[in-house]
Amino acid sequence: MTYSEAGFQIVLTGNVVEFSGKLEKSSYEKVDEFLRNIDQTVSAPMCILDLRQLLFLNSSGIRSLATFMLGSPKQFELRINPEITWQKESIPTLTYLKPNAICLAA
């Protein structure tokens, strides 16, 4: 499953969701819908969100990720690139939303 727009792409392979490019939209309705479809499609109890190739994500995008994870019964592993400052500083706070269900991997 793939969702893409100019400048970014989200690809589901198995239970791994890879984000790439720059996600800086003002409206995330289509992204939110795609994430909901992923939640219904992935049968594994663990979903890996690979953000290592995501160069930018604005606050609305972070909210979309948070809403997706909070609304899902799955466990999540967030893979980040510690070389990208916004990922290193912003993404770890998402683990506080569901401490027993969201973990961080670099």
Where are these regions (language model features)?
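STAS-typified acidic loop motif
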Residues: 1-35
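Structural motif
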Residues: 20-22, 51-52, 81-82
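Residues at alpha-helix caps and immediate loop-helix transition turns in enzyme cores, especially N-
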Residues: 30-31, 61, 90
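Amphipathic, Lys/Arg-enriched alpha-helical "gate/interface" segment within cytosolic domains
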Residues: 64-69, 73-106
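Short, glycine-/small-residue-enriched flexible loop/hinge segments at domain edges that mediate gating
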Residues: 38-59, 79
